[in-house]
């Protein structure tokens, strides 16, 4: 038995297993070699820098094993022929500050996605297997300021690149023999694409998963030679789902510095734009993670009761490229919160909703977003939900014994540095709680959360109860058996979603509205609480409510 294993890879003959184990803080850091039948395993490499996490995998071509040490801003890869498990691992390119790269293999070349030399949105280069160092890198796809090269899959006769432009993914397919390429684009105004495993190396078919705010998750085979998409399976939505009954939109708000901030929105097709429709507005905005415009059958419960759902694609996420992330981390973090406020003001000004019908939600680092926004502009919102929220930024980032803390200095900064401490203090939700009115708030956490310890939201709620000057409801709900991602059981997770939606619908006066929308959706019913007056950390997925 081997404990705390994070990733594994087998040699070509199946006789040797390479595996990585985690340390006390759940950081993958040691690479071992296990020979079947041997009594002891050999430690090959230990990643001593706590900013870095280690992984191991085998290439799709099956010819090479790769190990990668990666931080939020740097990377260092090594490779080993899969048919030489007792051989020596070879460095590709040593780690450098602000240089991230990924590697794949095809033929006699390594394909490397790199953002070195200041090319923040990445470019694609190739290097000979015999000499993969940076001096031999040859450019295939150049850097483009407004196009993020997100991922690459290499096959025997083609490679497929995931590019993100204006917040949306498209596929770039290149024939290796000729260098000719074409794009695969999709018609909806907002959607999400993810690659399926695609384990076969010699194939013209690329399998992908497509979904949008109104299109259920759908698996397609794309024939790269014939340029045809074949639908293999679409997730069934019970109850006679008709996508034509719903409308999705792509909007843009303008931040205070002139930056255009994307918004994805979905509602019933007959939802009026008169300022009277309730809305759930969600966001994340950290770690360069793009908030997916994905489908949710559970969300129909909100839409069918006249609630519009909107996603704020704010800075700090990855929707608009690497610079979008850079503009919302470290000493730029406040852009994340001011962008969300700008999105809110735009949706109100354009009469998609009004403050008395607006609920906001975020989980983990998205909980930090919601907590910060509530301190800055509580008057804009009627209710808020914070799930496993990272709300005590300074104290958490000062405690290096906690999982993730050291590794996230590159995202938040190290508060032992006075400049970072003062900046964190300017937005930390816990620190900035004050004697002011707040909207109705639900805070949820889990006892077994290893990313955001349960006492962090608990102390936030305790301090908020002491300081807030309103009589609005403040609820604290703790799941005694769940972790950072919520309940693991399917039905437990559905029960949690039902609780959340019931709470949201009650807040906006739609709890008694039937799912067929029998009540008029053009006006808000009297909200349970009057509108107030006045002016995750990653490491475990938190399923978005929206």
Where are each of the predicted segments found?
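Peripheral, non-catalytic segments that deliver or gate enzyme domains
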Residues: 1-276, 287-305, 332, 345-349, ...
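Conserved catalytic motifs of the protein kinase core domain
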Residues: 276-278, 357
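A fold-wide structural signal in alpha/beta-hydrolase
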Residues: 279, 303-313, 475
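The conserved beta1-alpha1 loop
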Residues: 283-285, 445
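Active-site-proximal cap/loop segments of hydrolase catalytic domains
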Residues: 311-517
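Intrinsic disorder/low-complexity segments
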Residues: 516-546
């Amino acid at each position: 038995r081997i404990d705390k294993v994070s990733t594994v890879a087998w040699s070509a003959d199946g006789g040797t297993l390479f595996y990585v184990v985690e340390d006390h803080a759940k950081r993958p850091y040691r690479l071992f070699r296990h020979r079947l039948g041997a009594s002891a395993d050999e430690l090959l490499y230990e990643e001593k820098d706590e900013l870095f996490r280690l992984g191991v995998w085998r290439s799709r071509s099956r010819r090479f094993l790769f190990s990668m040490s990666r931080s939020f801003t740097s990377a260092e890869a090594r490779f080993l022929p899969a048919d030489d498990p007792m051989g020596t691992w070879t460095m590709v390119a040593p780690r450098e500050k602000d240089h991230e790269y990924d590697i794949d293999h095809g033929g006699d070349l390594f394909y490397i996605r790199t953002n070195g030399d200041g090319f923040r949105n990445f470019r694609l280069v190739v290097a000979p297997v015999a000499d993969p160092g940076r001096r031999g890198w040859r450019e295939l796809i150049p850097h483009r300021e407004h196009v993020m090269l997100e991922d690459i899959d290499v096959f025997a006769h083609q490679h497929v690149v995931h590019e993100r432009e204006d917040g949306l993914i498209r596929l770039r397919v290149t024939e290796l023999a000729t260098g000719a390429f074409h794009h695969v684009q999709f018609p909806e105004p907002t959607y999400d694409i993810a690659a399926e495993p695609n384990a076969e190396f010699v194939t013209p078919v690329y399998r992908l998963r497509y979904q949008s705010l109104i299109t259920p998750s759908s698996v397609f085979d794309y024939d790269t030679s014939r340029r045809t998409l074949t639908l293999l399976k679409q997730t069934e939505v019970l109850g006679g789902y008709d996508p034509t009954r719903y409308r999705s939109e792509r909007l843009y708000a303008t931040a205070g510095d002139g930056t255009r901030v994307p918004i994805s929105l979905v509602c019933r097709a007959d939802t009026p734009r008169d300022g009277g429709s309730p809305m759930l507005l969600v966001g994340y905005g950290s770690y360069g993670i793009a908030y997916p415009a994905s489908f949710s059958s559970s969300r129909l419960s909100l839409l069918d009761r006249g609630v519009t759902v909107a996603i704020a694609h704010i800075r700090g996420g990855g929707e608009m490229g690497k610079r979008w992330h850079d503009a919302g981390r470290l000493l730029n973090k406040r852009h994340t919160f001011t962008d969300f406020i700008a999105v809110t003001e735009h949706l109100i000004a354009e009469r998609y909703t009004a403050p008395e019908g607006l609920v906001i939600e975020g989980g983990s680092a998205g909980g930090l977003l919601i907590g910060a926004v509530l301190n800055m502009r509580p008057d804009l919102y009627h209710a808020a939900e914070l799930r496993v929220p990272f709300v005590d930024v300074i104290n958490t980032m000062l405690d290096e014994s906690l999982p993730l803390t050291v590794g996230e200095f590159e995202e938040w900064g190290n508060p032992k540095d006075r400049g970072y401490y003062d900046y964190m203090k300017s937005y930390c939700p816990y620190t900035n709680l004050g004697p002011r009115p707040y909207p109705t708030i639900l805070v949820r956490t889990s006892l077994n959360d290893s990313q955001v310890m349960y006492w962090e939201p608990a102390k936030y709620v305790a301090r908020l109860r002491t300081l807030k000057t309103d009589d609005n409801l403040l609820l604290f709900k703790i799941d005694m058996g769940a972790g950072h991602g919520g309940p693991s059981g399917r039905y437990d997770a559905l029960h949690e979603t039902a609780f959340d939606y019931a709470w949201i619908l009650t807040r906006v006066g739609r709890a008694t509205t039937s799912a067929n929308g029998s009540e008029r959706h053009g006006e808000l019913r009297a909200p349970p609480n009057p509108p107030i007056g006045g002016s995750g950390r990653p490491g475990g997925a938190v399923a978005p409510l929206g």
